[in-house]
């Protein structure tokens, strides 16, 4: 085993959408920095970013009902929906900039216009959906949203969903043509190809073994070349851990105080994938339903048109599975090894409190294929068993952490953890994840490059014209920027 030493300015751990985005931002803002990226697999974007390991929804709260809460008085709080949409607007602006400048090309290879729709059944749910739309339509970001209970209108949007449906059933559906399907794996590959052209060191089949703080304030990152078994010690001023499910174990190796009292619970996803081309081509939308009362946000059912390498696909899910692995290509010991003295109480507290999650997972694990098809028939009443197959999607590690309110709180969003001195950052969690990558990486830069960030703002505003402002509060700016975005990304 040979040990070598090398110095660099930035180390990115993980070859997914987060590291690719942060690397791209850094090369635009400070091109002189030396950057090294390490990925354990043989190519980028193969874990959570892979097209089959996520639903590819450009999360904009156009269809996801869990981003709007209903109050006891019937009012609907749209605060989170606006925030999620604003984050995706930032991503789209940055991608449009990269296309305009020629850094990446062929947007149709990673983003497609696919209408986003919400679908509910029952009088109470219909009432909620109407209130939701009435609240959202007042905001410029949601001005194109439509709602209908008319069977003929709904049939014109999603004919397959109306075939065989009972006419006396109370249903309502929303429709927003500005929705998108995003292949984050393809986008990741484009971003990393661009980084390679800018002399970023892209190292595949390299596994990070350890991360240690040095006396001089830098980090020592121990990396093993899986091709040769050589081990190299890298010294870096800044480290970003964007390794999906592996981020938590790597963060724990740093021993920073911010890594304490954080745990993770892995959940795997299963989808039904359509095998019948006729069915696939007769549906063109991402249709999100409503989770059962008490079920976790990850359980929201959706019927998704996908585009994979130019070919149209159709998925339904997710159904939860369980594996103690933190990555699809991980170890069965991942969960056990993540339990430390400093997070044991955190994990146990969550186990006691999260009865609904436990109940949901047990019920999901007991589902037969016939029962999964029955769930699909809520969306497609005439779905045939032989047209669908089960596929395993990616692993998600839900963050468990102590909060001011209590110990062991399960978190369903995306979490950025940074060291006190800003020399290290890690990304944990799941949805909305990739859709918000650009905004999240701006957050990382603001926290970790405080002294430089102000001087970067003119360039940032060139890349993302709305930076620092809320498009939801600047109607004219939104329309102006959106026209540019539509032109370069070729979306509606």
Curated annotation (Swiss-Prot):
Pathway: Carbohydrate metabolism; tricarboxylic acid cycle; oxaloacetate from (S)-malate (quinone route): step 1/1. PANTHER family: L-2-HYDROXYGLUTARATE DEHYDROGENASE, MITOCHONDRIAL. Gene3D superfamilies: D-Amino Acid Oxidase, subunit A, domain 2, FAD/NAD(P)-binding domain. It comes from the Bacteria. One of its GO terms (molecular function) is L-malate dehydrogenase (quinone) activity. Keywords: FAD, Flavoprotein, Oxidoreductase, Tricarboxylic acid cycle. This is Probable malate:quinone oxidoreductase 1. GO terms for biological process: tricarboxylic acid cycle. It catalyses: (S)-malate + a quinone = a quinol + oxaloacetate. InterPro entries: FAD/NAD-bd_sf, MQO. The lineage of its organism: Bacteria, Bacillati, Bacillota, Bacilli, Bacillales. Pfam families: Mqo. Its cofactor is FAD. Its EC number is 1.1.5.4. Belongs to the MQO family. NCBIfam families: mal_quin_oxido, PRK05257.1-1, PRK05257.1-3, PRK05257.1-4, PRK05257.2-1, PRK05257.3-2, PRK13339.1. It comes from Staphylococcus epidermidis (strain ATCC 35984 / DSM 28319 / BCRC 17069 / CCUG 31568 / BM 3577 / RP62A).
């Amino acid at each position: 085993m040979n040990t070598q030493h090398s110095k660099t300015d930035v180390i990115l751990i993980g070859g997914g959408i987060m590291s690719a985005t942060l690397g791209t931002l850094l090369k635009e803002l400070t091109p002189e920095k030396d950057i090294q990226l390490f990925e354990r697999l043989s190519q980028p974007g193969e874990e959570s970013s892979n097209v089959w390991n996520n639903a590819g929804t450009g999360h904009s709260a156009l269809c996801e009902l869990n981003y709007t809460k209903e109050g006891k008085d019937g009012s609907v709080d749209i605060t989170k929906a606006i925030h999620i949409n604003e984050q995706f607007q930032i991503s789209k602006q940055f991608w449009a900039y990269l296309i305009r400048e020629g850094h990446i090309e062929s947007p149709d290879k990673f983003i497609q216009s696919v209408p986003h729709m919400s679908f509910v059944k029952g009088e109470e749910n219909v009432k909620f959906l109407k209130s939701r739309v009435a609240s959202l339509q007042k905001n410029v970001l949601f001005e194109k949203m439509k709602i209908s209970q008319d069977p003929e209108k709904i049939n014109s949007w999603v004919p397959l969903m109306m075939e065989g449906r009972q006419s006396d059933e109370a249903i309502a559906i929303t429709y927003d043509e500005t929705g998108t399907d995003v292949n984050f794996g393809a986008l990741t590959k484009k971003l990393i190809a661009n980084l390679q052209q800018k002399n970023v060191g892209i190292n595949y089949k390299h596994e990070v073994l350890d991360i240690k703080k040095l006396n001089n304030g830098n980090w020592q990152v121990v990396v093993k070349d899986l091709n040769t078994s050589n081990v190299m010690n890298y010294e870096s001023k800044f480290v970003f851990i964007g390794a999906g499910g592996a981020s938590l174990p790597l963060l724990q190796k740093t021993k920073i105080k911010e890594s304490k009292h954080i745990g993770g619970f892995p959940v795997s996803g299963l989808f039904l994938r359509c095998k019948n081309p006729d069915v696939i081509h007769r549906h063109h939308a991402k249709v999100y339903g409503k989770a059962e009362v008490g079920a976790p946000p990850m359980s929201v059912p959706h019927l998704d048109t996908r585009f994979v390498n130019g070919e149209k696909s159709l998925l339904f899910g997710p159904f939860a599975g369980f594996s103690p692995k933190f990555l699809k290509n991980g170890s069965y010991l991942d969960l056990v090894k993540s339990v430390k003295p400093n997070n044991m109480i955190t994990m146990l507290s969550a186990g006691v409190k999260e009865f609904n999650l436990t109940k949901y997972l047990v019920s999901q694990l007991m589902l037969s294929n016939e029962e999964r098809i029955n769930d699909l028939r809520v969306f497609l009443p005439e779905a045939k068993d032989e047209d669908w197959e089960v596929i395993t999607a990616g692993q998600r590690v839900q963050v468990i952490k102590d909060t001011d309110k209590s110990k062991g709180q399960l978190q369903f969003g995306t979490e950025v953890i940074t060291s006190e001195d800003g020399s290290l950052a890690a990304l944990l969690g799941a949805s909305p994840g990739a859709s918000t990558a650009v905004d999240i990486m701006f957050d990382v830069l603001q926290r970790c490059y405080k002294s430089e960030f102000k001087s970067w703002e003119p360039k940032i505003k060139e890349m993302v014209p709305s930076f620092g402002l809320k498009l939801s509060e600047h109607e004219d700016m939104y329309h102006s920027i959106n026209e540019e975005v539509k032109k370069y990304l070729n979306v509606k």
